[in-house]
Amino acid sequence: MILTGSEIKKQVGLGRIHIAPFIEKHVNPNSYNYRLDKELLEIIENPIDPRKNNHKFKKIILTDKGYTLQPGRLYLGNTVEEIGSDYYVTSLIGRSSVGRLGIFLQITADLGHVGAKHCWTLELKVVQPVV
């Protein structure tokens, strides 16, 4: 079941959904607009060996000047918000307005466990350079 925006607000108020920080104007008719935090990690090794656990990353700090994301690269980011619930399964879905720019925000693991409350990891890939 997908909750309406008004039900999301109600459940946040009752403490059944955790969104911190919660900004009421980010509530949509059936979702909440999460935000990308200022720090990204770019995986800089090629090829990536999943048997190893010591991958090399380049840290990127996003500023008002922007940063150009490049195709063929994988960037890891986090949501600003901690999101979760002890009562509902959380689903993190990208916005169509972002998708139309050729940005994929959540490639895997879009379903959260009941009881988990955390900043979500976002896997960012672009199909064209995007600032």
Where are these regions (language model features)?
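DUTPase catalytic domain/fold
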Residues: 1-131
